[in-house]
């Protein structure tokens, strides 16, 4: 059993860091938020540019988003200019932008620094005091600006105000969409709020307002081919600007609906964050220790999920095959608290339904993290693709499926088979729990292996929460 010592030691370190960062922190002061928003009535409202970067996303998704952006711009009392930044140079999108009354632009050096280069182009072609960035699949509430700009106007040291990326979980969605939406709630509802107290909330790009003066000090968005949002937020913090996280659901997004799109999204998020860990600037930036610890907690999370994609099924299998006496009923007292938390408390805490598909989504993103970290170590990172683009849905996922079928599927069979064998050859109550756990693990694997049928459902306008709801 000594072989599990290093990963378990890492787990202890990771949990201690997470406890330091996330434990015993203040909750979001929603009463103060309401007071601040109600009291913001400037004589002259600041100018705002709304950047809408696009790169091959379905036109029906864009039409849905732009409809809500038009409502946002019409509601705002000041000058609000939606600006379509098209890296696909689509004549259809240019015409649709004109129909909506939006500015439209496409750069000559398309592909240069991917999305970061596209945003950099928009930065140089606009002049609003503030910039709202919305990804192609995020529909904003019409009052988004009035909910976030008061923070900017109240504190001139704030460079970014970030709101959650909120996803609805509906029965009409396929299981990948439901699972992908459910697993995001913990980060935006709890983790980001806790990190805000340590000045360590991260920028996630979409659904955020940027101060142009802050971006000026950085030369615009950070030029990098992946995760420019995380890097831009970190770089601005290093330049002395603050980031404010406001956990109020002001926009809603569309989750990936295929394994390829979900794998691509999770791979991109992991590789972007982990690239920061390996950069010289992360260790040299003049930021608070508590802020750096928040980023470290995120790095440890990705490493932990990748590591335990392999370790988690091995522990019960090794115990069943080599040390069945350690699974006696009298030892259950040590694992019951963890089982109760995992099976009951954690799912019940979520507002979104946290069902089998959420656990399958967790298994899938574990493999995405495995390959992202592996590719970083061998310096062969996959190219960037937008989550909702056609390319993302055709993403090469052969190694992901090999991992799912051979490792996850294989360990599920061995786990259940070994537990059944011990059940019939030993004292049944000793092995009932490990068999039940193995059956659940097998169900999670089976759910991930049975993919939903592709469909082309009509994109419906997103239902958004009321002003009083927090993420």
PLM feature segments, named:
Residues 85-93, 109:
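A conserved acidic beta->alpha catalytic loop
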Residues 65-79:
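Short, acidic, metal-binding catalytic loop of nucleotide-sugar glycosyltransferases
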Residues 1-42, 97-99, 304-305, 424-466, ...:
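N-terminal membrane-anchoring/stem segments of glycan-assembly enzymes
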Residues 21, 25, 106-130, 142-226, ...:
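Long helical/loop segments within the catalytic core of UDP-sugar-dependent glycosyltransferases
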Residues 135-139, 236:
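The conserved acidic donor/metal-binding loop of glycosyltransferases
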Residues 46-51, 81, 231:
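Cell-envelope/extracellular polymer assembly enzymes that use nucleotide-activated donors
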Residues 224, 233-251:
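Catalytic donor-sugar/metal-binding loop of nucleotide-sugar-dependent glycosyltransferases
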Residues 20-39, 198, 259, 269-431:
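Basic/Trp-rich segment in TM-proximal cytosolic loops or flexible interdomain/linker regions
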């Amino acid at each position: 059993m000594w072989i599990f010592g290093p990963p378990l030691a890492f787990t202890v370190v990771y949990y201690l860091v997470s406890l330091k960062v996330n434990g015993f922190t203040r909750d979001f002061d929603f009463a103060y938020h309401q007071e601040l928003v109600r009291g913001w009535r400037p004589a002259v409202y600041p100018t705002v540019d709304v950047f809408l970067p696009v790169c091959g996303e379905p036109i029906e998704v864009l039409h849905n988003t732009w409809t809500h952006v038009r409502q946002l711009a019409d509601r705002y009392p000041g000058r609000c200019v939606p600006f379509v930044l098209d890296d696909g140079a689509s004549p259809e999108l240019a015409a649709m932008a004109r129909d909506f009354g939006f500015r439209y632009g496409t750069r000559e050096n398309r592909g240069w620094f991917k999305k970061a280069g596209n945003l950099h182009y928009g930065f140089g072609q606009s002049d609003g005091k503030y910039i709202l960035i919305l990804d192609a699949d995020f529909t904003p509430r019409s009052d988004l600006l009035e909910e976030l700009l008061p923070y900017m106007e109240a504190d001139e040291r704030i460079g970014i105000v970030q709101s959650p990326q909120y996803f609805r979980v509906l029965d009409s969605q396929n299981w990948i969409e439901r699972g992908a939406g459910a697993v995001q709630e913990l980060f935006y509802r709890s983790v980001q709020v806790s990190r805000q107290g340590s000045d360590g909330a991260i920028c996630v790009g979409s659904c955020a307002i940027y101060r142009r003066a802050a971006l000026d000090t950085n030369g615009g968005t950070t030029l990098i081919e992946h995760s420019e949002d995380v890097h831009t937020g970190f770089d601005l913090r290093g330049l002395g600007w603050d980031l404010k996280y406001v956990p109020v659901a002001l926009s809603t997004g569309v989750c990936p609906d295929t394994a390829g799109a979900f794998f691509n999204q999770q791979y991109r998020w992991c590789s972007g964050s982990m690239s920061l860990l390996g950069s010289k600037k992360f260790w040299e930036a003049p930021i608070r220790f508590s802020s750096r610890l928040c980023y470290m907690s995120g790095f440890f999370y990705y490493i932990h999920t990748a590591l335990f994609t392999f370790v988690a099924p091995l522990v019960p299998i090794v115990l069943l095959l080599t040390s069945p006496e350690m699974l006696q009923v009298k030892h259950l007292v040590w694992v019951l608290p963890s089982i109760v938390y995992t099976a009951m408390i954690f799912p019940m805490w979520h507002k979104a339904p946290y069902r089998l598909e959420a656990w399958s989504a967790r298994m899938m993103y574990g493999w995405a993290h495995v390959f992202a970290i592996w590719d970083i170590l061998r310096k062969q990172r996959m190219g960037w693709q937008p989550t909702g683009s056609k390319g993302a849905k055709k993403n090469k996922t052969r190694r992901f499926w090999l991992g799912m079928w051979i490792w996850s599927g294989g360990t599920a069979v061995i786990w259940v088979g070994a537990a059944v064998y011990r059940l019939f050859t030993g004292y049944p109550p000793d092995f009932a729990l490990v068999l039940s756990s193995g059956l659940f693990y097998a169900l999670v694997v089976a759910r991930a292996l049975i993919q939903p049928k592709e469909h082309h459902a009509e994109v419906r306008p997103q239902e958004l929460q009321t002003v009083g709801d927090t993420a």
